[in-house]
């Protein structure tokens, strides 16, 4: 199982790596790749993914808020995901909201494009003041540390995969809404100190 490949591609200079979460993000990835004067990698899922509310043109900025927090209330944490894990992050957000947490979900289909946006835009998506961040990616997660910082955590593959139906493997490796929500709770608690 090639869990390290996207980290490897992300480490290559002048290469754009896209991991879209649904059909609209896939279209945005293709349009972006056609406009770039650099190599692009578009990593698609074999799973049937739901069409997500709020996805679309904003994906062309590389990262955007797909699950908004409650306005007027302190933001407790930010969940960052790409590909098939964006839906899992949105489900984890629902669980956390039921516990009274105010959480934002950011879809990050292309980190390279996101970091090319101006500072003002990046701050609207990932405000520096919010240190409680959890990134979710069913791959090796080394490149996600750029997004979560020293105070965040990553739910990622820590070893090679296995052979079984996708839903069985996601549960086995902890890529469930319940596990992601528990990780967010842990990060929030750790950052209160």
Stretches found by the model and what they are:
Residues 1-2, 25-26, 34-193:
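Thiamine diphosphate
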Residues 8-11:
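Hydrophobic, small-residue-rich alpha-helical packing segments that form membrane-like cores
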Residues 13-16, 140:
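Mobile "lid/hinge" segments at catalytic clefts and subdomain interfaces of large enzymes
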Residues 15-17, 77-78:
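Short active-site oxyanion
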Residues 21:
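TRNA-recognition modules of translation machinery and tRNA-sensing kinases, especially anticodon-binding
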């Amino acid at each position: 199982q090639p869990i390290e490949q996207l980290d490897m591609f992300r480490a290559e200079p002048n290469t754009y790596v896209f991991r879209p979460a649904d059909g609209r993000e896939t279209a945005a990835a293709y349009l972006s790749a056609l406009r770039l004067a650099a190599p692009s990698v578009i990593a698609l899922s074999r799973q049937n993914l739901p069409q997500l509310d709020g996805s679309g043109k904003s994906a062309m900025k590389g990262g955007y808020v797909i699950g908004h927090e409650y306005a007027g209330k302190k933001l407790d944490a930010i969940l960052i995901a790409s590909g098939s894990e964006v839906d899992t992050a949105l489900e984890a957000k629902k669980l956390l909201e039921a516990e009274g947490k105010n959480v934002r979900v950011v879809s990050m289909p292309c980190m390279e494009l996101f970091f090319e946006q101006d500072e003002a835009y990046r701050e609207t998506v990932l405000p520096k003041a919010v240190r409680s961040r959890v990134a979710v990616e069913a791959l090796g997660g080394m490149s996600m540390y750029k997004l979560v910082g020293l105070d965040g955590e990553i739910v990622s593959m820590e070893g090679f995969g296995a052979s079984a139906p996708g839903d069985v493997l996601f549960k086995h490796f902890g890529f469930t809404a319940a596990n992601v929500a528990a990780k967010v709770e842990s990060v929030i608690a750790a950052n209160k100190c």
